[in-house]
From Swiss-Prot:
The entry's keywords: Cytoplasm, Hydrolase, Metal-binding, Nickel
Protein name: Urease subunit alpha
Native species: Frankia alni (strain DSM 45986 / CECT 9034 / ACN14a)
CC per GO annotation: cytoplasm
Subcellular location as annotated: Cytoplasm
Cofactor list: Ni cation
Gene responsible for this protein: ureC
Taxonomic lineage from the root: Bacteria, Bacillati, Actinomycetota, Actinomycetes, Frankiales
Record-annotated active site: 329
Amino acid sequence: MSRLDRSRYASLYGPTVGDRIRLADTDLFIEVTEDRSRGPGLAGSGDEAVFGGGKVIRESMGQSRATRAQGAPDLVITGAVVLDHWGVIKADVGIRDGRIVALGKAGNPDTMDGVHPDLVIGPGTEIIAGNGKILTAGAVDCHVHLICPQQVPEALGAGITTLIGGGTGPAEGTKATTVTPGSWNLARMLSAMDDWPVNIVLLGKGNTVNDESMWEQLRAGAAGFKLHEDWGTTPAAIDACLRVADAAGVQVALHSDTLNEAGFVEDTLAAIAGRAIHAYHTEGAGGGHAPDIITVAAAANVLPSSTNPTRPHTVNTLDEHLDMLMVCHHLNPSVPEDLAFAESRIRPSTIAAEDILHDLGAISMIGSDSQAMGRIGEVVLRTWQTAHVMKRRRGALPGDGPADNARARRYVAKYTICPAVAHGLDAQIGSVEPGKLADLVVYDPAFFGVRPSLVLKGGFVAWAAMGDANASIPTPQPVLPRPMWGAARGPAAASSLTFVSPAAISDGLPERLGLATPVVPVEDVRRRGKADLPENTATPDIRVDPDTFTVSIDGEAVEADPVRELPMAQRYFLF
């Protein structure tokens, strides 16, 4: 019996157990720990489901006679390396009715051993060759200012399939505060998002002590609230908003009081009173109690996130932040008080500590802050740049060795399952698991985290790296991220979800607005805490010196040491 060496096997079928894969040009490697696509034992080798001329998936060979009515999947992605919060495995991934049905071995049970019963390939099954590729869940951007519709193509081209945030366009309120305020604006934005192949979670304005004004927004389609200092994040407003959120079962996102006008970080934590809350840009450059908002990452009830302009700490990070602040918060550089406000938020010591807290799993999520001090197309990229910098600085995480699976699982969770859990979306999205919407991203390993090869929305290709449409084959230059058939209006709506509060469902919102996109309620998140955020549950002791702004984590002071060079940068981008 002839045997294949590892190199030859990988070239035919993709890497298998024990093989390591470099992520883009970083120092990070993942190792395949299980291969479900091979079949039972070593005898399964050579019996993998592979598509192409003279290959396996042909009539009466790897393709069975099973009809769709008999359970054949609509799509199988063959031999992909799945990177998710729960592990790194190789599998064939089956999709039916837009949802993942199984991860295992696909093929024809009449001719092949070990075929998963939900992965029986039939004449109605499409194939995507995932062999040699990396597959992740679609990214969830947990901090989106909906300033312009052009953000959506940028997001999709970077592998983002879910947007959490708010806005109405380039209004001053939207440019600063991530809020879609009031029932009229919510109806307009829900209608506007109906045409795009993304899931949407709109946040209403929580800065009020009037309960009915918040319930009105919940009935109108808000799936949570945003508390923002530009609208006045006082202890009274925090308490009132959380009281309504507790009753409604929705999440609250917090941008606290940078100027400490209505209280200090201790007063905000007292107003939160142990209740679940999502703390945006926890480091503070994006806003929040100066200089010590970062200490909230130690609280078990606080679900902390970062926004991407401070990820990771580089020699250019501080310089770009001042101008961003002046624009985004409608400040005047000629007014000394406005300038002091901006400068108070930019601290190298807390930005440096943010790197460490991410690597510890103490800051659990990363979002963009799109066009409002953040870049929607760089959520995934900057997450992995941070992981690379931390490996170089801190070495392997516990459990890692030649490969970095523990670190990779922690960092992929920051933009997939963790924001999904935080906002009550995880029953539908956020991971590569059976039953969930097939929002999936396929990467060539050399471009991992930089540019996807394919972005699937609800099991249908919505975006892809595609060459000249007038060429004789799909690959001639220029190869650009382009919309595919899944981005057309009909499949875009059918393949996506609009998340709203349970109160909106009870009030008849889906029927009232007549949206084409399926409308589903968020899960109750009020009893969720950091312990529920996979791979990102740490609650270290965090202290900030009020005079020097030095941050100590579990008693150890963090020294600012910004990096001068990053991977996933000039090798891939001209600008």
